[in-house]
């Protein structure tokens, strides 16, 4: 049961969202690796912005604080006024958001990889934080729309277009 006493809806889009995000991260990784930032998205040539990477929990915390302090974020989502604490997470499987304590947990470096210390992952977790009620599906249409709005306003419209098109190709619904 959720904090407000309601049952959260079934998370039927979770696998589709994660599949789409993995594809998007791959596009950003290749753009960074090879220096070719222009990609074709369903016939449109788009130059991807640079995705920020983080070195530590402290740098993620600073970024989260700055995103939540943006005027347009505070104006759009009441929960932007609720501070988020960032902590390291054991293991390397996933980042996650803990609703009850407003905690964003990110796995740090595992070997040579720090896959979760990146802007797209942090914005995904912030989209969970900004949910107005605990009754919505964790990766449902409302979440996906909120995530894309964050990406659009923080990283840029080109990144948001890539996510929207990729999610659409994976069968993700928006609301």
Label every model-predicted segment.
Residues 125:
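Walker B catalytic acidic pair
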């Amino acid at each position: 049961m959720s904090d407000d006493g309601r049952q959260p809806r079934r998370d039927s889009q979770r696998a589709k969202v994660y599949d789409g995000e993995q594809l998007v991260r791959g596009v950003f990784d290749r753009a960074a690796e090879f220096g070719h930032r222009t990609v074709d998205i369903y016939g449109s040539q788009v130059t991807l912005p640079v995705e920020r990477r983080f070195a530590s929990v402290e740098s993620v915390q600073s970024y989260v604080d700055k995103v939540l302090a943006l005027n347009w974020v505070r104006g759009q989502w009441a929960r932007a006024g609720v501070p988020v604490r960032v902590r390291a997470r054991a293991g390397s499987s996933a980042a996650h958001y803990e609703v009850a304590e407003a905690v964003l947990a990110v796995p740090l470096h595992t070997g040579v990889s720090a896959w979760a210390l990146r802007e797209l992952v942090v914005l995904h977790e912030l989209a969970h934080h900004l949910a107005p009620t605990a009754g919505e599906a964790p990766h449902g249409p409302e979440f996906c729309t909120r995530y894309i709005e964050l990406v659009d306003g923080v990283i840029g419209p080109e990144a948001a277009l890539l996510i929207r098109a990729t999610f659409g190709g994976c069968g993700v619904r928006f609301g």
